């Protein structure tokens, strides 16, 4: 090893790390592109499989729940997986029982203000507004107000809600958040003139 200089060793180490990183990236990418063929035990792969199971003509709720559990084993703070478990539970029981409400609460603990899960979670909660606990309603109101302040999709989200009570509540909160955004930018007084 006397013939290897310090610079040669550094170059060899960097090349080795680059090869290992590209191999890991290839396995991960292949697993995400073909989740049924190559199956690394990664949370995003399990989440893709769970989504595919629910998108089937006849939703495969047991498979979706099993894949969501596997995703949570890899990434316990995956708000989408917690919310999907609540959705699957609701499909099975036709109501939001205590377990489903607990899953929704866990999705809020994982990601209180989204952002990736916000639209789906808000629509799901406002569709089942009468079944929500006061604590979950408060969290949904805070999330909707925040969403309306910083995003332009609030009215579209409200229109997508079919439950009349939930749509009414969402519309009030969305308007409140929108007005707060206008007030923050000094535009509310101008709009009233």
Predicted regions and their residues:
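Short coil/turn linking the two alpha-helices of tandem helical-hairpin repeats
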Residues: 50-62, 86-97, 127-133
């Amino acid at each position: 090893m006397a013939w290897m200089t310090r610079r040669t060793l550094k170059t060899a180490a960097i090349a080795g790390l680059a090869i290992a990183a590209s191999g890991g990236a290839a396995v991960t990418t292949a697993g995400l592109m073909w989740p049924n063929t190559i199956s690394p035990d990664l949370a995003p792969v399990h989440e893709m499989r769970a989504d595919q199971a629910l998108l089937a003509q006849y939703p495969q709720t047991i498979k979706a729940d099993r894949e969501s559990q596997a995703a949570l084993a890899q990434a316990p703070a995956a708000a989408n997986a917690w919310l999907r478990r609540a959705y699957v539970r609701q499909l099975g029981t036709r109501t939001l029982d205590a377990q489903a409400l607990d899953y929704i609460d866990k999705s809020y603990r994982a990601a209180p203000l989204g952002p990736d899960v916000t639209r789906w979670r808000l629509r799901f909660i406002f569709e089942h507004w009468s079944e929500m606990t006061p604590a979950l309603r408060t969290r949904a109101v805070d999330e909707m107000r925040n969403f309306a302040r910083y995003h332009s999709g609030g009215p579209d989200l409200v229109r997508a809600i079919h439950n009349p009570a939930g749509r009414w509540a969402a519309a009030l909160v969305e308007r409140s958040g929108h007005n707060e955004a206008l007030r923050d930018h000094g535009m509310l007084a101008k709009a009233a003139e």
